[in-house]
Amino acid sequence: MDPPSYLLDRTFLVALADVDDPNHDEAKESYRRLIDDFVAQRCLLVARADHLASVDAPQLFAAVDKLHVARQHRNAAKKMVRASGIDLDLAITLVLIRRYKLRKVAGFDERFAGYDITLIGPVTSPVDDNEPVEN
């Protein structure tokens, strides 16, 4: 039986590669656990090829397989955009999650909370303008 594949979203990749990102520490801890699971063959790690290419840390993601976005994925995503009005990049990711039957997603994009997707770690939400901000 093949281990489940977990998607590393662009927000997760950026947080992991950028030490100044507010989610860096959480991403680093999650990635350690994911790599341990990968080494123990309990999961496979995947990310969109275009998302991986946008992060300048190829050695950091050596264990991550690339998912290439094909024309059929873009076409399905465009239909989703027309039907729901969501962002094309998110729609492509949702299409890949469904097509590849990805079990979990590691990411910090709060929009994932609106879908039937199992997230790895908490999804952070931006500070509301009415909430006090701590120094």
Annotate each language-model stretch with its function.
Residues D9, L90, D109:
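Acidic active-site catalytic centers that drive phospho-/nucleotidyl reactions
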Residues M1, L94, R99-N135:
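Acidic, PIN/NYN-like endoribonuclease modules and their adjacent C-terminal/linker elements
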Residues M1-P22:
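Metal-dependent nucleic-acid phosphoesterase active-site entry motif
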Residues L7-L8, E26-S54, F61-A62, K66-A70:
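PIN/NYN-family metal-dependent endoribonuclease catalytic core
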Residues D65-A106:
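Active-site neighborhoods of divalent-metal-dependent phosphate/nucleic-acid chemistry enzymes
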Residues T11-F12, Q72, E110-R111:
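Alpha-helix/helix-capping structural signal
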Residues V19-N23, A49-A53, R99-A106:
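Short helix-capping/linker segments at secondary-structure and domain boundaries
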